[in-house]
Amino acid sequence: MNRSQILTDRQQQELNKAILQYLEPMLTESSSDQEVYRSLQQILVPPSSSSSEAIVDNYLEKKWSTVLRLQRKIIDLENEVGTLRSIVDGQQSVSNGAASVISKDRINWLPNRASKSFPTQQNQLVMASVIHPVLPVIFGGCSDGSIIVWNIVNDDTSIPEKIIRAHTRSINKLAFSVEPADLSKDLTKSKTYIFASCSADLSIKIWDSSSYRHIRTLTGHDHTVSSVAFSQSNPDHLYSVSRDKTVKIWDLVNGYCVKSFTGHSEWVRDIDVASVNSQLSLNNMKVSAELGDFVVTCSNDQSVRVSHAESGAGLALLIGHTHVIEKVKFLPAVSNTILDKFLKENHAQFPSIPQELVSDEIFTTTLGYKYCISGGRDNLLKLWLIPPPTLIPHRSPLPAQHNNSQGWAIADLVGHQSWVKAIAIHPNGRFIFSGSDDKTIKVWDLANLNVTGSVKCVRTLSGHDGFINDLDFAAFNRDSGKEDKIKEDATEEESHQQLMKFIEGRMRCLFISGAADNSIKLWS
């Protein structure tokens, strides 16, 4: 009998006895089974064997459970090492005063290493990935039209919780509703989070995230649907953009397209939505959004466009990229403190920006947006200040009067070696995450603007073997269950600190990436 080159003779004998011990209860019921057992016994433990020692009961099962316990212990220790390494990295991020200080508080949590990998099949490139708004569940949209769901607390990442055969062609985007909704308008039913998927098969589909039930299909686009985003002010509305150059607004209750407008001359790649209702404010968590939503879109025409959703009116154009723009996002209001300080202290660099505009409260009290960030095939990310629209009572907003309705480029984020395909924003508004075809994720610190005058990459995450197509940082619950108020006499700094404390208590330290290497990675 050929001996294992890995095990010693003693270990080989113990393994053979354990196999016989495990099989014995199954092979003693019939005469034929007993014959099989005797044959195995002759092979595994022949009479000539020098070892006659017995082994403990349930030897194989006990060995197996011990291995599993040790594997879990190794994972726990690896996570602990990763956490300690991130703390050391944070302490070393200050070098001769040339970088901003990153504290070890939870509010500044940053991913450091891939702790879990969720694989798909060979023909399932991950094109979109998203984290459930409240549950430890992640969703991946694949190139074959499948939506795959994993529970991240499960030890076996190779077994998904659900596979949904959603579309006939590649999925381009997955998006969750801002809050639970009931599209049936049946008051007796409990509300649940819904999510939307859009595809190259020209359709958008709406799903119940608790049962994975298909609710509705939206059709009307004439070409690939690139991206979708839920309304911030109306939970029943969804926005979509397409290669047919249009932006469409959908009523999810009846499935009708209620508005369609064209603002770009080529393929519209991405969309993000903002309203005064979406901007976190401790003084009033649910502000009435009289103007409704504002949307920002990007296109193959190398421009970023800010529009008023209800009227479709173009309000501002951001020009500066030299190639296709893949992604764009509004920055949250919590980012304003950092960027406002930079503009106020460096006014000479931006003579065309009126000083009073930087401090204008219209952005937070009326509009819900001020800055945005875009990334494209020129390997760059760009930070923009968006000029406010012209507001006339009882009329839709009109194009901005400042700077000929064009936005101001504040800073370029330089570091990627290939196309920037994904952008995510940290809940604290300070850190930007970008994913690229160079197979890396970069973490950018906006606070460096006020130290070095540029946005520095403070961390590069490597681990994927393919183009990175999507990123997501877990959302946090804006509803606190109690009234959160800022003192009327609080200074701007005190207000900001209280806002950070609010976010810190509700943020979830979950960050994922989806890539063309057939995997989603969870970073810790």
UniProtKB/Swiss-Prot annotation:
It comes from Scheffersomyces stipitis (strain ATCC 58785 / CBS 6054 / NBRC 10063 / NRRL Y-11545) (Yeast). Self-associates. Interacts with NDL1 and dynein. Keywords: Cell cycle, Cell division, Coiled coil, Cytoplasm, Cytoskeleton, Microtubule, Mitosis, Repeat, Transport, WD repeat. Residues 65-90 form a coiled coil. CDD domains: WD40. This is Nuclear distribution protein PAC1. Pfam families: WD40. One of its GO terms (biological process) is establishment of mitotic spindle orientation.
